[in-house]
């Protein structure tokens, strides 16, 4: 079944009492029970009834179930940001004395999360180039908790061989955790490439309008967590089984104790976003490819970076994994940082904003914003030069966007 049909025919196990075609927004902090036993059953996990809105909400559960059916996952947890999804995933698998082997080409806050936040909890960060599988494998030891990377890095747009990474991870008894935000699940099926845990900033493509923050934590339910060096996960396997330990820890410990469940308002907006996701993705990614091709002819632009371009070093690998439309983001390099800033300042249609995959096209200077707290030397190590401008392409007419780019580079 095609995505466009599948997404519109997924059915929730508990339909609305009034037969509403759209799931209602349950704006409530608490839920009433018919008797003391029903209340106890909900709080102790003997029933699926929501106990308190910090832990579960019917509107949020509806979004989780729809994504689970669409992706074929075992479970989905909807959180209030993409960073929360990453933080929960890495916290769930790690612990003091363990290490995480992560890509050195990550989003700036992901780097800080692993290096600073998890590092302060006693987790050792090991950053390496994930486009070089042999270097990844060399960093693994018996204290490694997981491998973590972005399927296409932001903003470098590097592409790793996902199946090769999966083979390495599984040969060592490790889970492969992937941030798939830049290419959504209508175009890329992470489970088919051996990804065990998928994290998505649903703020981006799924929301589509830049109206709400959200993150999805998707567990494909295939990894044997009894192999994990984490005592917390080993303990969970004895209670819920080898394949459910991760989700059990996320839902019954991390969500309950730390909060961060997605709000029902955002969950409602994202269920609507799912319905049109495939259509919007094809339009936006198609425009990105066309614009990247046109920008190659502009002499003021020194380099155009998009993995869908045939002269891109990652073109063949990108096409094999993501097809001919690997997302709606590309970057351009100008003569200098000053030229990059001047270009951004002159834009008239493309907005100056930090989000990705909004319906509106957006531009940002990564080195001075999302990587602005890193030193120039650190930015260079992460391949984020000051000459780069990142463009996220929206739904505007591509011809108008090209004219905007042309006038801004002059």
What are these regions (language model features)?
Residues 12-14, 27-33, 204, 221-222, ...:
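Glycine-rich beta-alpha junction loops
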Residues 1-26, 217:
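Short conserved active-site loop signatures built around small residues
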Residues 7-13, 75-297:
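Conserved PLP-enzyme active-site core in the AAT-like
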Residues 1, 97, 115-116, 121-124, ...:
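PLP-dependent enzyme catalytic core of the Aspartate aminotransferase-like
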Residues 30, 35-87, 109-117:
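Conserved N-terminal alpha-helix of the aminotransferase class I/II PLP-enzyme fold
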Residues 48, 74, 213, 266-270, ...:
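Short amphipathic alpha-helical segments
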Residues 289, 295, 300-389, 393:
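Conserved C-terminal alpha-helix-loop-beta "cap" of PLP-dependent enzymes
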Residues 40-46, 347, 405-408:
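Short Gly/aromatic-enriched secondary-structure transition segments
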């Amino acid at each position: 079944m095609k995505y466009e049909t599948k997404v519109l025919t997924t059915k929730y196990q508990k339909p609305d009492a009034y037969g509403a075609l759209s799931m209602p927004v349950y704006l409530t902090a608490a839920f009433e029970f018919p008797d003391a036993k029903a209340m106890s059953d909900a709080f102790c996990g003997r029933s699926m009834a929501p106990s308190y809105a910090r832990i579960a909400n019917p509107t949020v559960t509806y979004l989780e179930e729809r994504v689970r059916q669409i992706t074929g996952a075992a479970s989905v947890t909807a959180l209030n940001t993409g960073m929360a999804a990453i933080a929960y995933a890495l916290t769930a698998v790690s612990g003091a004395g363990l290490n995480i082997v992560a890509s050195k080409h990550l989003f700036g806050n992901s780097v800080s999360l692993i290096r600073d936040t998890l590092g302060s909890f006693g987790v050792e960060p090991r950053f390496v180039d994930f486009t070089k599988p042999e270097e990844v494998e060399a960093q693994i030891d018996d204290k490694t908790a997981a491998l973590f990377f972005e399927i296409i890095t932001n903003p470098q747009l590097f592409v790793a061989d996902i199946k090769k990474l999966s083979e390495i991870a599984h040969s060592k008894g490790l889970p492969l955790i992937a941030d798939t935000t830049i290419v959504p699940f209508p175009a890329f099926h992470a489970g088919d490439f051996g990804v065990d845990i998928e994290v998505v900033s649903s703020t981006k493509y799924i929301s589509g309008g830049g109206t709400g923050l959200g993150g999805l934590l998707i567990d494909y339910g295939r990894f044997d967590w009894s192999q994990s060096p984490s005592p917390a996960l080993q303990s969970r396997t004895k209670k819920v089984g080898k394949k459910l330990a991760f989700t059990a820890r996320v839902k019954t410990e991390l969500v309950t104790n730390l909060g961060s469940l997605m709000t029902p308002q955002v969950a409602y907006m994202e269920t609507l976003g799912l319905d049109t996701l495939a259509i919007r993705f094809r339009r936006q990614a198609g425009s990105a490819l066309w614009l990247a091709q046109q920008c190659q002819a502009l002499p003021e632009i020194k380099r155009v970076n998009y993995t869908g371009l045939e002269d891109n070093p990652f073109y063949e690998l990108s096409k094999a994994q993501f097809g001919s439309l690997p997302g709606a983001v590309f970057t351009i390099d100008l003569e200098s940082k000053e030229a990059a800033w001047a270009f951004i300042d002159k834009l008239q249609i493309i907005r100056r904003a930090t989000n990705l995959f909004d319906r509106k096209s957006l531009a940002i200077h990564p080195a001075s914003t999302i990587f602005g707290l890193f030193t120039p030397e650190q930015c260079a190590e992460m391949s984020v030069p000051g000459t780069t401008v990142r463009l996220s392409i929206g739904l505007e007419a591509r011809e108008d966007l090209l004219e905007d780019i042309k006038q801004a580079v002059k």
